[in-house]
């Protein structure tokens, strides 16, 4: 599975921890930036990710900002993107199973590293159910 990761300055530290953690697990996360804690604009980071997802350069992505809110709003303004803030195990599973989310979002200043890893592991290993009702609803999102 080809996975991208990106963060603004508020999520930079968490992004670096995740890259290191998953590298040790044999899971490669392609870093789309930012590359420092210097202030940057989360919409630009989100758009870099959404462009790559829509071009099918990656199967899924991780976006991180301080709260997860701003970067998720920016990503979800793009047709074809379904970015979900993951905050518990059930949400991590259902957002893939029912919504076929293609980007997991986290609040780097709001969530613990252990929780982020737990939720992303569920997200990345859960398949979309492909049930008609879910396909229909996803189709309605992109009208």
Feature annotation, model-predicted:
Residues 1, 57-59, 80-81, 99-101:
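Short coil/turn connectors at secondary-structure junctions
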Residues 56, 64-81:
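Compact, glycine-rich, soluble single-domain proteins
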Residues 45-63, 67:
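Short, structured active-site "lid" loops
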Residues 5-23:
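Glycine-rich phosphate/diphosphate-binding loop of Rossmann-like nucleotide-binding domains
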Residues 81-88:
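Short hydrophobic/aromatic-enriched beta-strand-loop microsegments
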Residues 4-6, 10-11, 89-143:
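C-terminal binding/interaction regions
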Residues 28-39:
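A short beta-strand-loop structural module common to alpha/beta enzyme folds
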